[in-house]
Amino acid sequence: MGTLTSVAFAAAVNIRFRSFHRENIKTTITTLPKWQKRLCFSSTEDSHRFRIAKCLGNDENSNRDDSIGENGETHKSSVVKTATFEEEDEETSKSSSTTSSSNEFGSDKTSMPSTIDPTYSSFQIDSFKLMELLGPEKVDPADVKLIKDKLFGYSTFWVTKEEPFGDLGEGILFLGNLRGKKEDVFAKLQRKLVEVASDKYNLFMIEEPNSEGPDPRGGARVSFGLLRKEVSEPGPTTLWQYVIALILFLLTIGSSVELGIASQINRLPPEVVKYFTDPNAVEPPDMELLYPFVDAALPLAYGVLGILLFHELGHFLAAVPKKVKLSIPYFIPNITLGSFGAITQFKSILPDRSTKVDISLAGPFAGAALSVSMFAVGLFLSTEPDAANDLVQVPSMLFQGSLLLGLISRATLGYAALHAATVSIHPLVIAGWCGLTTTAFNMLPVGCLDGGRAVQGAFGKNALVTFGLSTYVMLGLRVLGGPLALPWGLYVLICQRTPEKPCLNDVTEVGTWRKALVGIALILVVLTLLPVWDELAEEVGIGLVTTF
């Protein structure tokens, strides 16, 4: 039992603690400002058994003429009332659950207002609706049911679960148990999909995400993803993309010419050198003096551009038999190498991983073949007395930038030629060197570079993650690439970090010889980008090594 006494209440309060309008009270009540009209006060006894709260200016009760107590009587005067009640009053509990929370306080636990602003909650809902409206079109639920009933079954793939599929959950992923050979089941499902839904959807066979174990038939467990064609297939090349590609190509031509000019810097006429180095020189030199200088720089520019175009030609020649569409190349200019290569996108979905490997390797192999030819011919001409007038002077430190190319140059040119401050070489050596370095950078196994695509196709997406992290670490520590590691790493992070999208059949592995080709290519990439350390350079005589 408990006893609570209230003194000089502004309104009579019954055991249910209803609040009453002030017009029913004979005592004089001072009119409160608007900001105080909904101010609530509460007081609690030391026993903490009961709480009384009184709210002034309750709008919901403003039209009430009287207040009804527990016994049904009307109270119109201020009284002092003592209420004695049981701690566990069943009647009070029932009345608390049925009366309005705005004017009754018959429960020990008063409902707390939500801490979330209604405006923010409404904004969240509107944002989700906007994302759904502007996002890619999702698969029709009616089509999902139809495809599930018509395509899948006991003899192909028994569906046990469905999940969202795609970057924004715009597709459906069917999980279950495979009931046949992967390739045969997938081919059968693709034929049925065309019969049921025509060309409306694309079906992907991928490895089951978060699989708890391998498939009983061998290999990874598979699942099938369904996406609308307009969502899963890349869009056509737009006009502004052609404009950007043209601008980048012109800039790449300029950077290649600049590389050729830099290689011929020792051949500048004395008048031109004096004009640019003497602050007192006023009269500019005759521009005709630069014509022979520019003509001598163009062969190197032609060589660099030829390697780039041959690289892209390899991609396109490999894509045509596979009926894969490629975008126009977006060449990336660079003043050190002439170019960082080009960004070439797939404009159609790849059918399988073997196709991804073939197209990805075709470009680097074509570019590397032409680069090796130029490099070899250039080294041979560098030793011929008849080509002495065509040779250019380069710092011997250049040959320390690549372990593989430095050792080949050392074996061809000899100790005396490389163990000096400068080395006389043919411009084709520089063109081949730049082409091989650019090809090696593009074959790094990261993102959607040629090397990343090849590794993803040959060894799977999990292997690409491991290779990619290792590549980023080695670039960050400048283990690979030397002074070009930082700009190349930034370029990859900005433009090429995202892995390629899965193929239609992203489960069937490639053959052993394709894996071997990718492995050999990666070894050559490391040897090309690995600099010659000082101890080895001093021992074999590549450049002049200064030790302290």
Swiss-Prot record:
Tissue: Expressed in roots, leaves, cotyledons, hypocotyls, stems, flowers and siliques.
Residue stretches spanning the membrane: 242-262, 290-310, 326-346, 361-381, 388-408, 416-436, 474-494, 516-536
Cellular component terms (Gene Ontology): chloroplast; chloroplast membrane
Pfam families to which the protein is assigned, alphabetical: Peptidase_M50 (PF02163)
Cystine pairs: none
E.C. code: 3.4.24.-
GO BP terms: chloroplast organization; gravitropism; negative gravitropism; photosystem I assembly; photosystem II assembly; proteolysis; response to ammonium ion; response to cation stress
Membrane topology: Multi-pass membrane protein
PROSITE patterns: ZINC_PROTEASE
Compartment(s): Plastid, Chloroplast membrane
InterPro entries found in the cross-reference section: EGY1-like (IPR044838), Peptidase_M50 (IPR008915)
Protein induction: By ethylene. Down-regulated by dark.
GO molecular function: metalloendopeptidase activity
Compositionally skewed regions (Basic and acidic residues) per UniProt: 61-76
Transit peptide: 1-18
Chain residue ranges for the region called Disordered: 61-116
Superkingdom: Eukaryota
Gene deletion effect: Reduced chlorophyll accumulation, defects in chloroplast development and abnormal hypocotyl gravicurvature.
Keywords per UniProt: Chloroplast, Developmental protein, Hydrolase, Membrane, Metalloprotease, Plastid, Protease, Transit peptide, Transmembrane, Transmembrane helix
Comp. bias (Polar residues): 103-116
Major site of localization recorded for this protein: plastid
Family: Belongs to the peptidase M50B family.
Role summary: Membrane-associated and ATP-independent metalloprotease required for development of both thylakoid grana and well-organized lamellae in chloroplast. Required for the accumulation of chlorophyll and chlorophyll a/b binding (CAB) proteins (from both PS I and PS II) in chloroplast membranes, and for grana formation and normal chloroplast development. Involved in the regulation of nuclear gene expression in response to ammonium stress and interacts with ABA signaling. Carries out beta-casein degradation in an ATP-independent manner in vitro.
Protein name per the record: Probable zinc metalloprotease EGY1, chloroplastic
